[in-house]
UniProtKB/Swiss-Prot annotation:
It catalyses: [protein]-peptidylproline (omega=180) = [protein]-peptidylproline (omega=0). Plays a major role in protein secretion by helping the post-translocational extracellular folding of several secreted proteins. The keyword RNA-binding does not apply. The lineage of its organism: Bacteria, Bacillati, Bacillota, Bacilli, Bacillales. PROSITE patterns: PPIC_PPIASE_1, PPIC_PPIASE_2, PROKAR_LIPOPROTEIN. It comes from Bacillus cereus (strain ATCC 14579 / DSM 31 / CCUG 7414 / JCM 2152 / NBRC 15305 / NCIMB 9373 / NCTC 2599 / NRRL B-3711). This is Foldase protein PrsA 2. Residues 1-20 form the signal peptide. Residues 134-224 form the PpiC domain. The gene is prsA2. It is found in: Cell membrane.
Length: 285
């Protein structure tokens, strides 16, 4: 779901527009106090100044993506029903918590999310798949947050310390530390790019220097490398791994959305909002 405040302001503007039906006068009052008056024009201007660019970005993004990447209504409804079943009687409360007006508003968000997933799928080329055509490997790692600590661990390993024991003592990866850092077998496109690049460069038994990723600093040990399977046998699983990796990467989604909006040749007629697509970035998915 996208930024909660956008939905709240969308609802406010909808309410304002409804209440203003039949009132053409911009000096009509929205609220008054003993010595204060808030006019309709002033209220609308404040909303536009504060939230107009965010709203325009979101509305245009949804329109461009959902029209280019069609998602069947049955698929959207299926996802909506899945969430409704998950939350049961709390579903309406969940909508309120996210600032969504009603189920239809939620459905539009699901449709946008699924359309973005479709855009991500279409972004994967045959070259991307072939670039990730590599043998399945098995690795262990020790993850820490500080680079100097990672360097110290590497020095201990170079001096003969047990990788498995150091992983149990020092690694911050709770899922693998009790297994001596063992990550099991994985294919290309499964791990963080920086991690994978380093792991695939190692020979079996070799230990890497500290590798930085968004999770911290890794010291990686390659423990096995399988024989490379025929391309036709693994290409579908490689593509699926790439889809999952890109879908889970907010940076990739943001970049892809910006590229799609650029290709849409958007023209803004309102001078107050003219720089929306150069200054405003998406709030997230």
């Amino acid at each position: 779901m996208r930024g909660k405040h956008i939905f709240i302001i969308t609802a406010l503007i909808s309410i304002l527009m409804l209440s203003a039906c039949g009132q053409k006068n911009g000096s009509a009052t929205v609220a008054t106090a003993t010595d204060s008056t808030i006019t309709k024009d002033n209220f609308e201007k404040q909303l536009k100044d504060r939230y107009g660019k965010d709203m325009l970005y979101e509305m245009m993004a949804q329109d461009v993506i959902t029209k280019k990447y069609k998602v069947p209504d049955e698929e959207v409804n299926k996802e909506v029903e899945k969430v409704k079943k998950q939350y049961g009687d709390q579903f309406k409360k969940v909508l309120e918590n996210y600032g969504l007006k009603d189920e239809e508003d939620f459905k539009n968000q699901i449709k946008f999310k699924l359309a973005m997933n479709e855009a991500i799928k279409k972004s994967i080329t045959e070259k991307d798949v072939k670039d990730h055509y590599k043998p399945e490997i098995k690795a262990s790692h020790i993850l820490v947050s500080d680079e100097n600590e990672a360097k110290e661990i590497k020095s201990k390993l170079d001096a003969g310390a047990s990788f498995e024991e150091l992983a149990k003592q020092e690694s911050q990866d709770l899922l693998s530390k009790d297994k001596g850092g063992d990550l099991g077998y994985f294919n290309s496109g499964t791990m963080a790019p920086e991690f994978e690049t380093a792991a695939y460069k190692l020979n079996v038994g070799q230990i890497s220097n500290p590798v930085k990723s968004s999770n911290g600093y890794h010291v990686i040990k390659l423990t096995d490398k399988k024989a490379l399977k025929p391309y036709d046998e693994v290409k579908d699983s490689i593509r699926k791994n790439l889809e999952e990796e890109r879908t889970a990467d907010p940076v990739f989604s943001k970049k892809l959305l910006q590229e799609e909006l650029k290709k849409a040749n958007i023209k803004i007629n309102d001078s107050d909002l003219k720089d929306t697509f150069t200054l405003v970035s998406p709030q997230g998915n």
